Structures are given as C-alpha cells and as structure tokens.
Amino acid sequence: MQQAEQLRGQQRHADALAIYERVLRANPRDRGAYTMRAITLSDLGSAQLAAEAMWRHPDWFSQQERERIENDRVARMIGWASAEPIDAAHRYAETDQALVNVARIERESPPTLTWEATRLRVDSLVALNQRQRHRDVVANYQALKAEGIEVPAYVLPTVGDSLMGLRRPAEAEAVLRQALQHNPDDFNTQLLLGYALLEQERFDLAMPLFERLAATQAPWPRRNGASSGYENWDRFSADIALATARSAANHNRDADALLRERVAIGPDNAELQAALASIEFRRGHPSAALQRNAMALTLDPHQKQARSGVVEAQRDLDRLDLAAATFAPLRKEYPDDAGLQRLGASLERQRGWQVHLSHARGRSDNDTLTNSTSPLGNDFGSTLLEAESPLLGERWRVGLRARDDWADFQDTRVRYRSFWLGTHYRYDRLDVSAYGGRALDEFDRDGTAWALDAGWRFSDAWYGSLAWRTRDPDASLQARRFGITGDSIGAALRWTPNDESRWELQARQLRYSDGNRRDQLDLSGSQRLWASPHVLLDGLFAASAGRAKDDRAVNYFNPRRNSAVAAGVRIDQIGWRRYDYAFRQRLEVTVGPTYQSGFGSQWVPSAAYRHLWSLGDGSALSYGVSWSRPIYDGRREQQLGFDLDFRWGGTP
C-alpha cells in the first residue's frame, strides 16, 4: 500500500491501481485498498466505476471522499456530453442527466466542503453552456462573484462563450482576457477573444489576432522522433475564423479564396464545406450555397451550420415552405439556440405582412430664377404606400397600393392620385403580380389603370423581368396636365455576378394617348473599387438613350433624340453597427455629358447624401438629400430634393 501511494505521488495511477487490485484479490474487505482503488479510478477518468464502488460501501468513504467522487462523476458526464452523439435526438442526454444529478446532490446531500460545493456550481456552468442556457450561465457566474468566490480560470472561456451567445461581446472580452492572464497561450480562448473583438467592430485588434493564430499554427506539426506530422485541428479552426473575419471586414473575395484552397485539400470535411457555403451566401449566391450545404450534409447529416445555411438559402430563394420544413427539426433539436431563434423570427417576418412607405419632395429652378421649364415642375413630390398580406398557401399575397404624385407647373398643380388592389405570386424562380387601380384626381377621375409585372430568376447572377402599365404613374405629369395619359411596356435584365458588382439594362416604351411614342434604353452599374471594414468605395456608371416616334410638337418635354452618360463614385461609411442594428451614411457623386437634339451636349453634375438605418427587426429606414444641375431644352436648372424610404417585413 505504501508503494501504491508513492506511485500515486508520481502520477503513475495505473501502476498504483494494479497494486490495489492485487490487495483486494487477496482480501476483498480491505477498506483502505477499496477506497483508494475507487479514488484512483476517478483520477484515471473512470468516475462512474468509482461512484459505483462508493455506492456499494458508502460508509467506507469519508464525507470528503464521497463528495469528491460524486463531483468527479458529474464532471465526467459533462465532459462526455461534448462528444458528438450517435443519435441526434439524444444530443443533450448526458448534459441533462448531469444537471439532474447536480440538482439532486444540492437538494439531498449538499457538499459540506467549500471547494466541492464551489466545484459543483462551477461545473454546472459548463453543462448549462452546453445546453445553451446562456442566461443561467451568466447569472450563476455573477452569483459566484457576488459571494466573493474566485471562479477557476478553466471555466472562464465557457462564461465568455455564453456572454457571446447573449450578444454581450464587451463583457465577454473582459472575461476572456482574465482567462488569458492565467493561460496566455490557450488557443480556444484566443479564438473566442477574436470573435468578441470582431462583434464589437474592433477589426484593428481582431484581424491581427486571427492572422497570427493562423500563421503560428502549423498544419502538420511533428513531434520529436516522429516519422510524420499529425493533423492540427487548431490550424483548421484558425483558418475558418480568419475567413469569417475577412468576410465580416468586407473582403468576401479573400475569404472565398482561402476556403476554396482548403476545400481542395479536404473536400470531404463537412464543416469546411458549410463554412464555404456561408461565404457564397454572403457573396449573393444562394443557389450555390444551397448546393454546397447539401454536399456538407451528405458528409454529415447533422452538421448544424449546413442545416441552418439550407434554411437561409431556401428563404432567400423564396421557397419558404422548404425553409420551414428544414427548420422545424433543427429547432426541435436545438430549442435554446439563440441564433436559431433569430433565424425563425426572420422566417416569420418573411411570411408575414410586408409594408413599404416612401416619400420624395423636390424643387427645380433655372439659372435666371424665373419659372423653371423642368418637366418635373417647379415643385414636385410623390408618396407611395405598399402593403401586402401574410402568405396565403405559401405563395400568394393580397396587396394594396396608394400613390400620390404631384408637380407645380407655374401656377397649376397637376396630381395623379391613385389606389390599387391586386395579388402577388412569388415562389422559387417566378415572381408575378397583377394590380388594378383607379385614379382619384380631377385630371383623370375614375380612370382605370392596370399593372402587370413578371420576373424570372435564371441563376444567382441573372434575373429578368417584364412590366406592363396602363395610365402609368411614371408617365409625364406635364402631359397629364393636358389630359394626356401614358401606357408603358418594359423589360429589364440584371446581372449580379457577386457582392462587388451589379449591372442592369432596361428598355421601356411609353405610349401616350395623343399617339406619341417614346423609347428609352438605360444601362446602370456599380463595381467595387476598394473596401475596408467600415468603408466601401464603388465606381458608378450610367448611360441612357431616348427617342420620340416623330417630330410632332407636343405640350410636354419630348426631345426627338436624347442621351446621357455619367460616371462617379459611391462612398458607404458604416458609422455604427451592432449585430442587426446599423447606421450608414452614403455619398454619391457623378458627372457626365448629356445630349439633346437641337441643343447639343453639356456636362451635368449630381450629388446625393443619405443616411441608412437597419433597425434590427428586418426593417430599414433611409433618407437623404440630392442636388443636380440638369439641362432641358438648352436651359440649365438646379434641382434639390429630399426623399425618405421605410420598409418593414420585406419588400412587397
């Protein structure tokens, strides 16, 4: 027995266990050997066997020994609970049993030793974190601190993780830095700290940390004397984190390249495929992300990130029934997951009411400060309200529109006020809406208007649409002043290869009731020029060409030929952001020549400044001012404008 104690002191527990076994074979009633065998089993990680031995002869153990073995058993159950379960339906079986045991011990035989009582409460923090009961983790941690109990460093990363789950990254940072004071080289704690900094928008600190972690983790480290290296999964985690950080810093292209390189090395890694799918989704490729997540789920049907990625992709591809079907079992398996709760809320918003309200007001004056000849009028404005019902049959909505457009032409105010009712079908690739409206103003009272729109998504990059209108509200109010209305037919093709580039070509013909026809062709696009975590710089380009059917004289702006080209830049600056809440300011400046037949060409500058708010519940508010110096019939004018736009629940 003395030799066994010496071996235990040398951390040679297996050799000590062999001695206790020999003693017990000779004398099964040897209490000393029996208790020390149980304690040694617990030291070796076999806490369940130790507990079973203690339950057979509890009076052979001291109170301290009983408490230690019980707590070891609970701790071991919590440790095993972190392993991937064979059956996902029993994912939390060990965790829940551990929490039941903690409650039973505290209720029936609370530890008398201060350390064992503290240890039980500390270990329960890990179990609660596994169960994603983050509020309980933080509350219990704060209770320990309030009692003056020093929480062991090994559990501080768990507390930090729960604070991150509650979206309290500043507090998480403080806890994680405290943990690193005790173990500055701990990889997982440093990784969590990087995420905490990232979620505070501290890219200046987060990016160097992620870069350093990736650079210092060898992919195949080799121990002394080994013939080959071993897999370093910390390097894998560092690469995933670095790609995530680059994406958050508006460098999706770099994140995509990094993960594609890793996928080429390990294509059968489900977590890696799911990570790349999330980057593809952020780049505006939901179909590609859906396909890659399907690959990940083929490799691992329980991969959580891939499953939630499928829900997001199906939602954005307007397949809400499939998204809901995928989400239901995921939500059941992870009932306390805060991220999934937010994903579920986004699905409900997408299925619910959708409202859009916009208002614009402007004024135009010419250089001589006399009455402007602008086709928009001296003063002009518009108000639009769109509302659509929750989904009916997973595809249909019923909607209404109310619109008021007006303009002052010298001493006359011309108005087009209308009310519309219709239906909207949207599912998968097809988007069709049909509305009927009635004019409510004196210029065309009780005039019936129709609007039909159809769109088709060819791929992640290509989208085409057709539009047909009678009594088009976008037709000239100058013409409406003389009782002339305009119908229109148009087509558009949009190409969005990624999150950095967007181009659209539109063709439209206006057919006025006086027999006049106007054809218009517009090309517009933007291309990312430079990006940083909080500033985006895009190049802008626009070109247009229009023509009238003939040279007839009309009482509204109708140039025989006109064209324009403009180029400029757009600067987006993220002034403040906290998860789904954000404030951005945007400045756009363009300049280019415009041509009108009979009047030659001149250069036209324009500028606009806007504020954009993301309000956290799927709604968005933007407002701004604009300035330009357009030319009509050879006369230069100055236009000033203000506009406001609010969307709630999605885009009608």
Predicted regions span which residues?
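N-terminal targeting signals for Sec/Tat export/insertion, comprising classic cleavable signal peptides
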Residues: 2-30
